[in-house]
């Protein structure tokens, strides 16, 4: 097993990535607004349909709300709290992957180790929730052995 990466380092990296995602969505919203207004059109004057700037802005706004809500989930995690079971804020090391319970993410690399963010809404989380070190969980024909939790 690899060495334990400090939970505070994992959380800090996740917060940074989430902020970058929020910044990206904010910039995209501004770009779409600027493009619509530069074409002398307000969003409601553009063509109807799924490609209209108004609908696109609405979709972007919903996605921005979602990533902001995820940021609040991350901010609610206290890295000083040790975890003995799979729960929000836990780092869960399995025989397949290492997960950080909070929000879903593609994965971050710290000190050569890849850590995947897992949402409490993820199907795998519902199978792992409450389990302890040494327990095993089967999900989607894959057996996960929990090697460490902290």
Task: Say what each PLM segment does.
Residues 1-77:
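N-terminal intrinsically disordered, low-complexity, charge/repeat-rich segments that act as generic
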Residues 136, 146-150:
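Conserved hydrophobic positions within beta-strands
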Residues 80-138:
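Non-DNA-binding regulatory cores of transcription-related proteins
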């Amino acid at each position: 097993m690899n060495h334990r990466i400090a939970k505070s380092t994992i959380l800090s990296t996740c917060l940074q990535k989430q902020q970058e995602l929020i910044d990206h969505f904010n910039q995209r919203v501004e770009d779409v607004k600027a493009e619509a207004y530069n074409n002398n059109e307000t969003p409601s004057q553009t063509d109807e349909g799924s490609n209209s700037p108004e609908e696109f802005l609405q979709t972007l706004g919903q996605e921005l709300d979602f990533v902001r809500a995820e940021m609040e989930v991350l901010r609610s995690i206290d890295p000083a709290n040790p975890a003995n079971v799979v729960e929000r804020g836990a780092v869960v090391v399995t025989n397949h992957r290492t997960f950080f319970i909070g929000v879903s993410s593609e994965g971050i690399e710290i000190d050569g180790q890849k850590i995947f963010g897992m949402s409490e809404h993820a199907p795998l989380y519902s199978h792992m929730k409450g389990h302890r070190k040494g327990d095993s969980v089967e999900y989607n024909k894959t057996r996960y052995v929990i090697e460490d939790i902290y």
